[in-house]
């Protein structure tokens, strides 16, 4: 129902964790490095689960999905916050960019402000800043490229493989003490 463009999928995940006040988040131990970092930046505790995923996975127990490797019709899960990536290596090769899909109007309004330094899409001297936001909006140039690419995007697309598969994040010193459940 709603789509909020961001500068990348990582910041989309961070904003979703912040919006929901995430306390403890469980993700696969093999995923992209910035995902657990975004969880830690949100102030949540991180846990790993050892399983192989395809296309997307949930940031458990929250209705947040990392869908960086999936972009196809009918993929949205009602009541969720689905985070997309438009990196040059992903389906929609904008170069840089991300998006949050949701059916929540309230969350959409919060994400729009959060991605834009906490302000509405007006000059900041004409606004009242109520939330602490980020400089995480998609540039107009990237948005224009994305709109152009969407004109010829197919309805049904297979999930992107990751070969070789992601490195086990527990091999990094930063994550060596993360509990595995």
Regions found by a protein language model. Give the residues of each.
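PLP-dependent aminotransferase-like
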Residues: 14-74
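Gly/Ser/Thr-rich phosphate-binding loops and adjoining beta-strand/alpha-helix segments
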Residues: 2
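Phosphate-group recognition and catalysis centered on beta-loop-alpha active-site segments
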Residues: 11-14, 81-82
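Extended catalytic core of nucleotide-activated donor transferases of GT-like folds
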Residues: 71-73, 80-83
